[in-house]
C-alpha cells in the first residue's frame, strides 16, 4: 500500500522566537470580549440520562475528580519515547499514592465505560481523506507490524493505532460530557483528566505529526460546541513543544482561544509570539515561547500575568488543557526546568481559574512526558492539586538538578506578549 494515503503535514521551519509586529491593541480587537456575558452560567439540556455509559447525577455530585484511561497498549514501538509504558506508569503511581476510587471511594471516579469517537467526530477537526487513509493503512500495519505515517517524521502506527486513537478521543469527549452534566447541578463540578494516548496536539487537520495521530483536545472542543452548545472554549497548552495542530485547527476561529507556552526553538519550530491567529480569529491565539532553562518561577509568573488576564477577558464556557509533562527538568526531549511542584501549582491554579471564569468546567488531556518517573509523579501531584490536597512534590523533586532561570529573557517575552495582546 502506498503511504500517499497519509497526507504529510506542512512543516514550518525556523525558531519560535519573538520577532513580529502584529498587535491586536492597534485594532482594539480585545474590546470585543468586554461585550460578551460571562461564560460561568450556560443553558445546557445535556444529561447523563441520555448516555447510560456516563456516571449518574449522584456520582457526579459526589466526585471531585473524574478520570478516564486509554493506554493504547497495542500502539507501541520499543525504545520510542511515546511508548505503551507511559499510561500504565501513571496508573501505577496513582495506585501507589492511593489516588484511585479503590482508596478514595466516591471522591474519585474512573470513567471506565465510554463511547468511542466516530469518524464524524474526528472529521470535525481532521480532513476525511486523512482519517480514511489512516484506517486503510491499518492493513499494511497489520502485515508489517509497524509503519511510519508521517513521511520522514517520527510518528508510527501499528495495527491497532486507528482504533486506539478513536478510543482516546472518545475518552476525552466523555469527560467533557460528564463535567458539563455535573455543572448543571453544581457550582463546583469535578475536574476531568484524560489519561490517554496517542497524544494529539501536534496532529494537524491534514495528517499526523510529532507522535500525535488525532487532535484530542481540538476534537473535544468542537464536541463541546456542537453537542452542548458551549460557545467559547479556552485551551491552555503547557507541553514543552508548541501545540501546532491545535493552533492550526482554530487559527481563524474567534470562539476558541488557544494559549501555548513552550520552549523557544523546540520542535516543531512553530509558535512564534507573532502568531496571534488569522482573519476573524486574530487575537485569539497567544503563543509564548520560553527561553531554555525556564522553570517554576517563570511559569508561575506567566500564569498570573498572561494566562489569568487572557481567560478573564475571553470569558470562556469551559477550559481544556493540553497537559504535557515534558517540560520537567528530568525529561530527555527538551531543556526547561519545570518540577513536580510546578505541575502541582499549574493544576491548582487552573482549577481556581476555571471556578472563577467558567463555573469550574475544566478537563485535562495528557500530551507529552517521556521520563516515566517524572511523568507519573507529576500527574499524581496534579491529581492532589485538583483534589485540593497538599503537594508531595518535595519527596520527588531534587533541587540539585536546578540552576538559575533566565528571568530577564522570560520577562522580556512576557512584556512582548502583553504588548501584542494588550494585557
Curated annotation (Swiss-Prot):
Expressed in stems, leaves, flowers, siliques and mature seeds. SUPFAM superfamilies: Arginase/deacetylase. Keywords: Chloroplast, Chromatin regulator, Cytoplasm, Hydrolase, Metal-binding, Mitochondrion, Nucleus, Plastid, Repressor, Transcription, Transcription regulation, Transit peptide, Zinc. The active site is at 202 (proton donor/acceptor). Its main location: nucleus. This is Histone deacetylase 14, chloroplastic. CDD domains: HDAC_classII. It is found in: Nucleus; Cytoplasm; Plastid, Chloroplast stroma; Mitochondrion. Residues 62-392 are annotated as: Histone deacetylase. The record marks 370 as: Polarizes the scissile carbonyl of the substrate. The gene is HDA14. It comes from the Eukaryota.
Amino acid at each position: 500500500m502506498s503511504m500517499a494515503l497519509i497526507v504529510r503535514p506542512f512543516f514550518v521551519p525556523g525558531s519560535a522566537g519573538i520577532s513580529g509586529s502584529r498587535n491586536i491593541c492597534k485594532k482594539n480587537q480585545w474590546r470585543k470580549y468586554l461585550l460578551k456575558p460571562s461564560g460561568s452560567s450556560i443553558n445546557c439540556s445535556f444529561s447523563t440520562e441520555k448516555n447510560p455509559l456516563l456516571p449518574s447525577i449522584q456520582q457526579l455530585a459526589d466526585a471531585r475528580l473524574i478520570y478516564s484511561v486509554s493506554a493504547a497498549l497495542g500502539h507501541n514501538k520499543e525504545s520510542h519515547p511515546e511508548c505503551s509504558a507511559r499510561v500504565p506508569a501513571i496508573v501505577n503511581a496513582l495506585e501507589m499514592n492511593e489516588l484511585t476510587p479503590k482508596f478514595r471511594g466516591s471522591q474519585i471516579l474512573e470513567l471506565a465505560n465510554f463511547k468511542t469517537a466516530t469518524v464524524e467526530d474526528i472529521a470535525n477537526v481532521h480532513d476525511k481523506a486523512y482519517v480514511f487513509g489512516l484506517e486503510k493503512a491499518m492493513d499494511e500495519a497489520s502485515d508489517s507490524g509497524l509503519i511510519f505515517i508521517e513521511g520522514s517524521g517520527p510518528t508510527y502506527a501499528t495495527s491497532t493505532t486507528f482504533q486506539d486513537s478513536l478510543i482516546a478521543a472518545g475518552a476525552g469527549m466523555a469527560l467533557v460530557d460528564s463535567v458539563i452534566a455535573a455543572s448543571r447541578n453544581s457550582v463546583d463540578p469535578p475536574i476531568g483528566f484524560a489519561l490517554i494516548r496517542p497524544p494529539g496536539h501536534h496532529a494537524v487537520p491534514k495528517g499526523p505529526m510529532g507522535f500525535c495521530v488525532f487532535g484530542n483536545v481540538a476534537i473535544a472542543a468542537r464536541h463541546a460546541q456542537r453537542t452542548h452548545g458551549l460557545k467559547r472554549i479556552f485551551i491552555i497548552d503547557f507541553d514543552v513543544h508548541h501545540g501546532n495542530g491545535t493552533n492550526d485547527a482554530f487559527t481563524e476561529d474567534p470562539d476558541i482561544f488557544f494559549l501555548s507556552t513552550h520552549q523557544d526553538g523546540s520542535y516543531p519550530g512553530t509558535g512564534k509570539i507573532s502568531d496571534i491567529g488569522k482573519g476573524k480569529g486574530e487575537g485569539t491565539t497567544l503563543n509564548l515561547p520560553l527561553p531554555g532553562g525556564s522553570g517554576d518561577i517563570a511559569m508561575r509568573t506567566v500564569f498570573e500575568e498572561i494566562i489569568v488576564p487572557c481567560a478573564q477577558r475571553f470569558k470562556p464556557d469551559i477550559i481544556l488543557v493540553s497537559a504535557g509533562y515534558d517540560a520537567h527538568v528530568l525529561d530527555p526531549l527538551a531543556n526547561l526546568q519545570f518540577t513536580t511542584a510546578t505541575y502541582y501549582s499549574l493544576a491548582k491554579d487552573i482549577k481556581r481559574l476555571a471556578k472563577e471564569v467558567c463555573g469550574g468546567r475544566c478537563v485535562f488531556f495528557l500530551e507529552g512526558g517521556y521520563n516515566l518517573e517524572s511523568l507519573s509523579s507529576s500527574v499524581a501531584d496534579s491529581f492532589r492539586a485538583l483534589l485540593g490536597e497538599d503537594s508531595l512534590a518535595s519527596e520527588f523533586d531534587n533541587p540539585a538538578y536546578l540552576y538559575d532561570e533566565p528571568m530577564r529573557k522570560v520577562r522580556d517575552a512576557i512584556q512582548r506578549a502583553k504588548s501584542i495582546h494588550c494585557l
